[in-house]
Amino acid sequence: MFLIASVEHKGAAMAEAPIKRALISVTDKTGIVEFAQTLTKEFGVEVISTGGTAKILEEAGVPVVPIESYTGFPEMMDGRVKTLHPRVHGGLLCRRDNPGHVADAENNGIGMIDLVCVNLYEFEKTVADPSVTLENAIEHIDIGGPSMLRSAAKNNDFVTVVVDPADYGRVLDEMRVHDGATTRASRQQLALKVFKTTAAYDGAIAAYLSGVVEAEQSKFPETLLVKATKEQDLRYGENPQQSAAFYKMPGAPAHSLANAQQLQGKPLSYNNLLDTDAAWAAVREFDDPSVIILKHQNPCGSATAENVVEAYDRAFACDPVSAFGGIIAVNREVPLEFVEHFADINKQFVEVLIAPSFTGEALERLSKRTNLRVLATGGIDRSRELEMRTVDGGLLVQDLDHADEAADSFEVVTKRQPTPEELNDLVFAWKVCKTVKSNAILVAKDQAGIGMGPGQPNRVDAALLACERAEAACERMGIDSKNLVAASDAFFPFRDNVDTLAAHGVTAIIQPGGSVRDDESIAACDEYGIAMVFTGKRHFRH
């Protein structure tokens, strides 16, 4: 029979709560042996433990009271029932300043438990495996762990609860300062972490089961549970007067921005993250070697070529002025030749360079530009399905938009068919135009986005702006401004868009179609000898 620690626990809610007895049961064994050894050797704490945790502690020489000895009941039902017992939860929930609670504990042989150290079955890791079965997932739903955590956290006036191995040192340091006790402020903070953890844990379970039970409906469930973990505080938000932080979503694709490794450079800012995400989303639309140079969410330079060095040359030439302070995204490993070329032709400031990987020689050369942020994603992943945006008091969720229309699905609506060269450029322009803010027109030639008309309230202004920039780019690149192609993210409401494009050397157009005046635009194309194709899919980007 264990002694009931009652007298020393009586009294009002304590600013300092002594730790005499601890219950330890963890899935993540990181640092647990050292933590338990210090509790027992330095502070004389009695340790109760369960299953695998008890075994590890005993092997390390830590005196352990097995949970079944403490409760008087064996672990049952394959371990499903081991800590769900009054001697456990009574010892956690008893208010030491309540005479009735203390009397109940004494009359029922319940001792006080002053510290709970528990972390949970790795449910999210389990269900992240595509081959996981429902049965296996359910077996990884922790019951006893959350129950103990919640009991201890509820009674944080008297009980210290630790759910994160990162807090072991903090608790021990405080016990050294306070003669084996913890402070109320620390216990409250640790309890808050517990409730955040258990809420997120239950949310992950609900999200998984929603996907299994609700099937297709689960994409947009009645209740959307979003768990995000703070990765870092940011220096400021979109502007210096705005504070900001970056959070990582659960199940982030392996090669996403959230999982990218920063290899060098200053910390990423809020605007860096926004623009890098847009640039990475744009460049991963392409299968061939491609480079996107992006500024303020718009691709001011874009090109596809036989290799990334040539693609960078042509993307930079599209608009060198706008490239200043931009983001460069590459969809291939970056070799030394790229970096040398990049350093030679681009003396301007670049915020971020992102690619799947970099050769060692490339990184060595890049290290000379200490302020340049270099990110490696480890690969290209197109598995992301949804995107979210906030509105005042709400959250918008939609399918991610992909420019995945194949050329053989296009409908040629004009008398003239596009040439093979025009068709290749149309496919390229269509993918780039999708990433431009609406209303958007993108003029291209030879697999380069030489003219961009982004974010205009009316489409004809977007067309005019794109054409003017294309003419300037052609002059700068030493190529003629004829035989250009144009992409529009949405249909032409009037034929004036065709008139504008035709006047500036455009010979082929790609757009969704669907306007009540499509016939007028088609007739205008036929007048100018322009080939036009409809994709049947719009790509607004707001």
What residues fall within each predicted segment?
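Glycine-rich nucleotide/cofactor/substrate-binding loop typically near the N-terminus or early
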Residues: G52-F123
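Non-catalytic interaction/clamp surfaces of large macromolecular machines
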Residues: P165-A166, R170-L224, L234
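Anion (oxyanion) recognition and catalysis
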Residues: T40-K41, E58, D142, A153, ...
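N-terminal glycine-/serine-/threonine-rich phosphate-binding loop
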Residues: F2-Y70
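Active-site/ligand-binding-proximal alpha/beta "capping" segment
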Residues: R96-I143, R150-A152, T414-P420
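Short, hydrophobic/aliphatic alpha-helical segments
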Residues: V33-F43, E124-I141, S147, A279-D288, ...
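ATP-dependent carboxylate/acyl-activation modules
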Residues: A15-I24, L115-Y121, Y201-G203, G211-H542
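Mobile "lid/hinge" segments at catalytic clefts and subdomain interfaces of large enzymes
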Residues: M148, N155-V171
